[in-house]
């Protein structure tokens, strides 16, 4: 990736990661790019702990519509969320679990407010499996232990960013799409970020930062 295109968001990996962490601390979303040889996509990511209905609506409006809740393996076990399929043969081994809906406080589960309620239910400290119905309209993703140092995915990046910002290890993500329904690539992601005032970083930035600081 031509790093100069990311210079408006920081001239180094460290700057971009610190800007993203600061944005997370203030409850603002960030855009995370993966490698051009991987998915070559940009995800808009919010801390699960602070996401609002307005932010969820933006994910739904500008994203693919598949809004995912990225959580740790420990949280998946706490909620008794099994994998979506027994044998995961997807190219990038994206670890979807069964989909979920809050058992209380939602109507159809589709609206932005309902999805936020489901997310807040799932990440509550005292959450138990019966707090959730299955299936639903929120797609949990199980993050690999070790985060981006183990798997260079948006799932792990969101959990790592939440942890580095001092939040629960949970993030809400959705891939950004163009108006014609195609996937937004780096140039479109940069323009989207400038339009809405988001920070941008790459997963490799996060890897470099974690290795440099041994965190």
Swiss-Prot record:
Specify the domain of life of the species encoding this protein: Bacteria
What does the record give under GO molecular function? 3,4-dihydroxy-2-butanone-4-phosphate synthase activity; magnesium ion binding; manganese ion binding
Q: How is the cofactor bound?
A: Binds 2 divalent metal cations per subunit. Magnesium or manganese.
A Gene Ontology biological process term: riboflavin biosynthetic process
Pathway participation? Cofactor biosynthesis; riboflavin biosynthesis; 2-hydroxy-3-oxobutyl phosphate from D-ribulose 5-phosphate: step 1/1
Which major enzyme category is it?
lyase
Tell me the PANTHER family matching this sequence. Answer: 3,4-DIHYDROXY-2-BUTANONE 4-PHOSPHATE SYNTHASE, GTP CYCLOHYDROLASE II-RELATED
Recorded family membership:
Belongs to the DHBP synthase family.
- The entry's protein name is 3,4-dihydroxy-2-butanone 4-phosphate synthase
């Amino acid at each position: 990736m031509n790093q100069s295109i990311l210079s408006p968001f920081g001239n180094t990996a460290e700057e971009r990661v610190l800007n993203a962490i600061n944005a997370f601390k203030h409850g603002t979303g960030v855009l995370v790019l993966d490698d051009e040889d991987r998915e070559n996509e940009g995800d808009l990511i919010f801390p699960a702990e602070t996401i609002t209905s307005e932010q969820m609506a933006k994910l739904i409006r500008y994203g693919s519509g598949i809004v995912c809740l990225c959580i740790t393996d420990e949280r998946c076990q706490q909620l008794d969320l099994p994998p979506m399929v027994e044998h995961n043969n997807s190219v990038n081994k994206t670890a979807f679990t069964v989909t979920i809906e809050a058992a209380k406080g939602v109507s159809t589960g589709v609206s932005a407010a309902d999805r936020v309620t489901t997310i807040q239910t799932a990440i509550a400290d005292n959450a138990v499996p019966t707090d959730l119905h299955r299936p639903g309209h929120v797609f949990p993703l199980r993050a690999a232990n070790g985060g981006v140092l183990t798997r260079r995915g948006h799932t792990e990046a969101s959990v790592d960013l939440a942890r580095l910002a001092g939040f629960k290890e949970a993030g809400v993500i959705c891939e950004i799409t163009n108006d014609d329904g195609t996937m937004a690539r780096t140039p479109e992601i940069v323009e989207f970020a400038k339009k809405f005032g988001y920070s941008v970083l790459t997963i490799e930035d996060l890897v470099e930062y974690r290795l440099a600081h041994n965190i």
